[in-house]
Amino acid sequence: MKTFTTYSFLLATACLVILGGCKKVTKAVDGTGNPTNPGPISKYTNPTTASATCDYDVSDTALTNHGWTKTFDDEFTGDLSNWGAVTGGLIKEQQCYEPANAQIVNGVLQITAKQESVTGPKSVGNDTTASFNYTSGWLISKQTFVANATTPKVRIVARIKVASGYGLTSYFWTYGSGAWPTQGEIDNVEVQGDNTKMYATDYSYGPLVNQNDVSGGIEYNPVTEDLSACYHVYTMEWTQSALNSYLDGKLVEAKTKGGQIGNLFGKAQQISLSLPVGGEFYNNLNIANIQGGTMYVDYVKVFTSN
C-alpha cells in the first residue's frame, strides 16, 4: 500500500538498482524523525478472526495433484541470484535500503532492520546523498508473474516469520514495473511489528500516473496467533475477478471490492520482500522506541492453473 507521489519513478527504477550500499558514518543518532508520517488510512477489519497454525507448511504435491503447476521456487538454499537488491532511501521511511541487510543464513532469507548511522542515496535512483539512522533490506524478483488468459489463476506463496518491534512493517507484495499504479500493485501481506496478531491486504490500480482508482481495497485480518512467533504460510491467489488471501492453507479473505481487480488481469508482477522502518503505518513516529528486527523468509513459490 505504498501510495505516494514519487513512487512511480521508484518502482520503475528499483529493480535495476543494485549498488554499493550506504556509507557508514560516526555521527550519533540524533533522535529526530519525520513528524509528518501518516498513520493507517480508514480501514475495514474482517469480522472473523483467522485461525493460524504455528510452523505450518504447504504441500506442493497436494497443489500439483489439484491441477497447479509450480513455476517458481526459491527455498534460499543457495544464493540470491533470483532477486535484485534495492539501495537508497524511500519517502516517508527512515532507513537506507542496503543489499547487505538481506542475507541467506542456514537456508533462510533474513531481512534485517538495524539502528546505525549511514549516508546513502536520498531515494532509490537519486544520486543525492542523505543521512539515515537505520538500514534495512528490500528484494525484488527478477522474474515476473501474471494472471492472464493462458494462466488465469496464479498463487504466490511465501513462508514467513514476520519481524516484531515498533516502527517495523513486514511486506510481501507484488507490483508491475512502470509508472505506478498503471501496472498494478498487490499487497499480499503487511504486518506492523507492534501489532503482529493482524495483517493487512490491499491492491492498487489506475490508468493515470500517481492516481489510485481502487476504492476501499485495504482489509485488516485479525488472527489467533502472534505472526512473529513462528513461521506461517501466506498465499495470494490472483484471478480475473478476485484476490483470495490464504493463511496457513485456509481462506481468510476473498477480495472482490475496490472496482479495479479486473484491470490487474494481464499485468505482469514482480515479487517484493521488504522491511521498512517507519512509513505509512506509523503516525507521529517515536524514533527512540525503534530497536530494529528481522523478517525471516523460508521460501517463496509461485503456482499457476488453468
Language-model regions, residue ranges each:
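Bacterial N-terminal signal peptides that target proteins for export
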Residues: 1-10
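Intrinsically disordered, low-complexity serine/threonine-rich segments
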Residues: 11-12, 24
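C-terminal motif of bacterial Sec signal peptides marking the signal peptidase cleavage site
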Residues: 18-21
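GH16 jelly-roll
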Residues: 24-25, 29-306
